[in-house]
C-alpha cells in the first residue's frame, strides 16, 4: 500500500482529490452568483423589483473588487497570512453573506424581521428587501473573488510542474458546473414563484457547505506543510508587500495586455449570463425553466472544452492562438444573437 513518505503533492490521486475539493468550493461560489439570473422575473413579481433594481443587485457583487480593489488587497493578504487563514476568513465571509442575501428575500424578514425597520429608514426609493440583499451581495462579492484567488494559489501549490494548465482548465470547468447547476436547478426549485425563497436558501446553504469543504482542505494543507517543512512565518516574510513590486507589475506591458484581455472578454460573458434567461424569454417566448436550460448549454460547453484546451496548451503551447480563437468565436456568437432569429442552442 502506498505510504506518504513522499510529499502529498507528489501523489497523483491526492492532488486530484484536492482539485475536486477546492473545485466544489468554486462550484458553489458560481452557483450562488448565477442562481438569481433565472429568477429575474420572479423577483420582479415578488418584491416589485425593476430591471434597474436587478441590474443594481447584479452589479453590487463587483463593486468591492472594482472600486475598492479588494481582489488586489485580498491577494496581498493571502501572501501575508497564507492559504489557510486567508481562505477560511474569506470563504466564511462569502458563506455568511450568501445567507444574509437569502435572509433579505425571506418571508420572515419581509414581515418585519430583524433589520427590516432599519433598512426601511433610508434610501426610500428602494425596498428593504432589495437593500438587505444588496448588502449581502456586496460582501459576498468581497469574499468570493478573494476565495477564487485562494483556489488559484492552492492549485499552484499542489500542481506546479505537474499538469498545471490542465488543473486550471478543470478549475474553470468546476466553476461552470456551478453555473450549469444554478441555471437548471434554480428555476425548477422556484416553481414559477411558488417556492422562490426555497431556491435562494438552497443556493446559500450550498455556499455554507463550501465552507465545510474548505475546512477539510485545511487539514490536508497543514499536513503537506508539515511534510515539506514549509513555514508560514518564513513564507510571509519572503512575500512581504513592496510598493516597488506593485508598480513593477502594473507597469509590465505583458501584464497590462493580459489584464485588458480579461476585462474585455469577461465583460462580454458575465453580464450576458446574468441577463441571458430573461433575453431568451423575451425574444423567443420561453418559460423561465426553458430559458434557464438553454442558457446552461454555455457553461456546459466551457466544462467540456476548457480542460481540453488546457491539456493541449500543456502539451503544444499556442496559448495566444487559443485566446484569439476564443475572442473571435465570442464576437460571432453575439452577432448571431443580435441580428438573427436562429434558435439560441446553435450559437451557444
Which residue stretches match the model-derived regions?
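Extracytoplasmic gate region of multi-pass secondary transporters
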Residues: 36-40, 252-306
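Central cavity-lining transmembrane alpha-helices of secondary-active solute carriers
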Residues: 59-76, 296-309
Amino acid at each position: 500500500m502506498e505510504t506518504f513518505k513522499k510529499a502529498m503533492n507528489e501523489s497523483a490521486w491526492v492532488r486530484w482529490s484536492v482539485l475536486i475539493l477546492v473545485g466544489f468550493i468554486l462550484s458553489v461560489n458560481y452557483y450562488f452568483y448565477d442562481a438569481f439570473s433565472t429568477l429575474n422575473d420572479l423577483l420582479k413579481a415578488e418584491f416589485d423589483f425593476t430591471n434597474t433594481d436587478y441590474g443594481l443587485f447584479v452589479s453590487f457583487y463587483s463593486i468591492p473588487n472594482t472600486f475598492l480593489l479588494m481582489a488586489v488587497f485580498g491577494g496581498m493578504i493571502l501572501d501575508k497570512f497564507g492559504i489557510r487563514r486567508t481562505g477560511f476568513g474569506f470563504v466564511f465571509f462569502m458563506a455568511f453573506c450568501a445567507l444574509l442575501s437569502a435572509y433579505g428575500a425571506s418571508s420572515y424578514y419581509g414581515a418585519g424581521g430583524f433589520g427590516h425597520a432599519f433598512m426601511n429608514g433610508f434610501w426610500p426609493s428602494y425596498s428593504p428587501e432589495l437593500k438587505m440583499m444588496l448588502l449581502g451581495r456586496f460582501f459576498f462579492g468581497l469574499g468570493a473573488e478573494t476565495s477564487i484567488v485562494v483556489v488559484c494559489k492552492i492549485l499552484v501549490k499542489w500542481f506546479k510542474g505537474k499538469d498545471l494548465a490542465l488543473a486550471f482548465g478543470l478549475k474553470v470547468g468546476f466553476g461552470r458546473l456551478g453555473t450549469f447547476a444554478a441555471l437548471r436547478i434554480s428555476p425548477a426549485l422556484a416553481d414559477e414563484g411558488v417556492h422562490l425563497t426555497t431556491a435562494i436558501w438552497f443556493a446559500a446553504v450550498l455556499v455554507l457547505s463550501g465552507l465545510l469543504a474548505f475546512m477539510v482542505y485545511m487539514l490536508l494543507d497543514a499536513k503537506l506543510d508539515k511534510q515539506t517543512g514549509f513555514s508560514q512565518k518564513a513564507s510571509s516574510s519572503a512575500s512581504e508587500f513592496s510598493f516597488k513590486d506593485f508598480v513593477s507589475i502594473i507597469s509590465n506591458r505583458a501584464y497590462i495586455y493580459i489584464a485588458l484581455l480579461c476585462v474585455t472578454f469577461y465583460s462580454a460573458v458575465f453580464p450576458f449570463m446574468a441577463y441571458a434567461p430573461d433575453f431568451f424569454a423575451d425574444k423567443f417566448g420561453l418559460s423561465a425553466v426553458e430559458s434557464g436550460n438553454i442558457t446552461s448549454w454555455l457553461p456546459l460547453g466551457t466544462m467540456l472544452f476548457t480542460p481540453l484546451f488546457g491539456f493541449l496548451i500543456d502539451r503544444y503551447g499556442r496559448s495566444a492562438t487559443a485566446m484569439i480563437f476564443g475572442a473571435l468565436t465570442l464576437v460571432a456568437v453575439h452577432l448571431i444573437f443580435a441580428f438573427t432569429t436562429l434558435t439560441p442552442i446553435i450559437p451557444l
